[in-house]
Amino acid sequence: MADDKKSVKKEKKVKKKEKKIVPRGKVYITASFNNTIVTITDMAGNTISWSTSGAMGFRGSKKSTPYAAQIAAGNAAEKAMDSAGLQEVDVMVSGPGIGRESAIRSLVARGLNIKMIKDVTPLPHNGCRPRKRRRV
């Protein structure tokens, strides 16, 4: 009786993910002093692909370089173009990092058409008290 239950196995059906064609999307570039994060979404905000300088193998102070931002943006663009057929994007840039401009140049070099570039860095209208100034 127990042997019959063991021999019956249910086969799981695995559905393949459908390849969505997204001709237009948004690119969010967050350039901090320590890292650069590139996220590519469709127009509704659903993530298609992402990449960071750290995920590209850069460590420590090399993560914050323009070259690391260029490699990360290029990788994210390649993934988005391959998986979703992305062609044109709106770019939202935030943060004070030095990888902002090189990341945008990398997107153009990969063949994405940029329709709009917008700086969405959050600036307070004299809100919370900032942390103390760094003295070197």
Curated annotation (Swiss-Prot):
Q: Which GO terms describe its molecular function?
A: rRNA binding; structural constituent of ribosome
**UniProt keyword list:** Ribonucleoprotein, Ribosomal protein, RNA-binding, rRNA-binding
Q: Name one GO cellular component term.
A: ribonucleoprotein complex
Q: Which GO terms describe its biological process?
A: translation
Which SUPFAM superfamilies did the record assign? Translational machinery components
Q: Which InterPro entries match?
A: Ribosomal_uS11 (IPR001971), Ribosomal_uS11_bac-type (IPR019981), Ribosomal_uS11_CS (IPR018102), Ribosomal_uS11_sf (IPR036967)
**Transmembrane segment boundaries:** none
Q: Tell me, what does this protein do in biology?
A: Located on the platform of the 30S subunit, it bridges several disparate RNA helices of the 16S rRNA. Forms part of the Shine-Dalgarno cleft in the 70S ribosome.
Its family? Answer: Belongs to the universal ribosomal protein uS11 family.
* Self-association and partners: Part of the 30S ribosomal subunit. Interacts with proteins S7 and S18. Binds to IF-3.
- What protein am I looking at? Small ribosomal subunit protein uS11
From what organism does this protein derive? Leptospira borgpetersenii serovar Hardjo-bovis (strain JB197)
